[in-house]
Amino acid sequence: MRTISLAKALLSLHLALLIPSAHADSLHDLQQALKKFEQSTPFSAQVTASVKNHSTEGDDQNVKEGHAQFAVEQNLAGLHIRYSPELLSNIDKEIETKKQNPQAPTPATEAMNRFNYSEISILLNPVRDIEDDLRKAQLVKEESVSYKGKPARLLHLQIPLEKLSEEERKNLKKYRTDLQIWIDESGTPLASRSIGKGSGRFALVIGFEFHFDVEKTYLTQGNRLLVAELSSTSGSSGAGMDTNEAITASLTLLN
């Protein structure tokens, strides 16, 4: 009996020692897979985007909504963003209408103002953003799961306040992001979700809070990783103001 108990104890210890190694292997697989994406394969795609912003200050409420569809093409000559004649016409009409009625809705203008290059690049270069998160994140655990009917691995990570850069930590008192990344058997990202919240103070007297929830699914085109679907909700409050925003975007390859 003593021999059996000792064998069980040794087996448990062996399995416990294997768990961190397995986690490290999956994280390593992801990091190595990201290096393979040189982000140089030419592509063209259609982007459909929408945004809704709701802000409140005292008794005043302001709701802005926007939606637009445009094409992007990236090759050796650079990035080309093409707006259709219909979209450009709608923006021109909204500008003229706004002159007559400052409260008139301007959905096309709102969408294009919101989806500038920095926002579009989130769809076009997720490798950069994932690698940035991994530099700050601490691995919590890994699961073997099924994603769209195929075997996958799910990494659970956390980004605490102390892992942020000095500039990012500025004015923050509390911060935490829980990050999930689904990868396939080779380590290629399939999807991700980041849920975060934080609070802090400006000038020692103005307190603020914020939260966000961002979901992404990915696709590959040659040696390029792209965001196929993005869904984001976020909110902040402070100095008597509350703001909530919801964004959705989809990217569909044309070639």
Task: Mark where each language-model region is.
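Coil-to-beta-strand transition motifs
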Residues: 42, 150-152, 174-176, 185-191, ...
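Positively charged n-region of N-terminal signal peptides that target proteins for export
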Residues: 1-8
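Bacterial N-terminal signal peptides
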Residues: 9-18
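Structured extracytoplasmic
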Residues: 25-176, 197-208, 238, 247-255
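Short aromatic loop motif centered on NTY/YTY
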Residues: 193-248
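Sec/Tat signal peptide C-region and signal peptidase I cleavage site
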Residues: 19-24
